[in-house]
């Protein structure tokens, strides 16, 4: 019967996962493979190539990667954003890191694919989310003046995209920049581990410290919207809130002394609530 067939398919998924686990892959790699498998099944269902009474993944939980704690202290972040460098290599590394931070923690793949010819705002859907769902959110974020200066420095006016005059594949370019960021951090005397992703994690951390709501931080980061029922007006509100959030986080980095009293008061309130 179809019921027994569905049970068998669910067992097959679990057996497949057990087979992959024997390869001693990391949880991150196993999670990627199983998510891709689920995506293939979902697309087949959507195209009516297969049908199930019960989804094969209903009893299987995809392993989650451990959260990478690569956020850095405000002082370290400020050193990188304001670093004076004497090589093109470190200049590119610093500017890409800075752009990620100034644009709400944007991922490198989305940043490199962005058309910046509209100088006031960027609009995109995260590639990482687009690969998992057909309902990917469109994110609209302001281009802060600090980001605009960097964009003007590197943008190809014909394509609107950043052009660093490297003839690398994206994968090799990403590795090249990662090494550059690590080298820059070392030269600046930063002891923490610093990677491109640190800009994203640190933006989220500072925004949280300032009391910016999680929903607004998620919007800036481009996290998928699980509600799926967001009306147009609400989306417009999120855009404005995101603009305020980004401006406030950048102002906090530039003028931390302005926020000292607020942060101390907020810490006291959080302590009383705990």
Over which residues does each language-model region extend?
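Catalytic-site neighborhood detector that most strongly recognizes the C-terminal catalytic loop/helix
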Residues: 71, 126-132, 221-255, 270
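Conserved tyrosine-mediated DNA breakage-rejoining catalytic core shared by Y-recombinases
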Residues: 112-150
